[in-house]
Amino acid sequence: MDMVSLKFIGVGCMAIGMLGAALGVSNIFSSLLNSIARNPSATEQLQRMALIGAGLAEAMGLFSFVIAMLLIFS
């Protein structure tokens, strides 16, 4: 296998990181909706914590995307 093929295999593996971020964000907001349904008085605090968690999970996906782009164009 040449280096170009290995590079694209590596980029394909980096897609797993973006998949993990998407699953993490969906899990966060699913839990948020369940929590708000159980305790509507805690909505403001739960939303704040969910947005922080979603931002951190999404940052991992963006880091994975940046590394994939670096692999493609290097």
UniProtKB/Swiss-Prot annotation:
Protein name: ATP synthase subunit c
Localisation: Cell inner membrane
Superkingdom of source: Bacteria
Listed transmembrane segments: 8-28, 52-72
The family this protein is said to belong to: Belongs to the ATPase C chain family.
Function: F(1)F(0) ATP synthase produces ATP from ADP in the presence of a proton or sodium gradient. F-type ATPases consist of two structural domains, F(1) containing the extramembraneous catalytic core and F(0) containing the membrane proton channel, linked together by a central stalk and a peripheral stalk. During catalysis, ATP synthesis in the catalytic domain of F(1) is coupled via a rotary mechanism of the central stalk subunits to proton translocation.
Taxonomic lineage of the native organism: Bacteria, Pseudomonadati, Pseudomonadota, Alphaproteobacteria, Rickettsiales
Topological type in the membrane: Multi-pass membrane protein
Gene Ontology MF terms in the entry: lipid binding; proton-transporting ATP synthase activity, rotational mechanism
Keywords, sorted A to Z: ATP synthesis, Cell inner membrane, Cell membrane, CF(0), Hydrogen ion transport, Ion transport, Lipid-binding, Membrane, Transmembrane, Transmembrane helix, Transport
Xref: HAMAP family: ATP_synth_c_bact (MF_01396)
Encoding gene (name): atpE
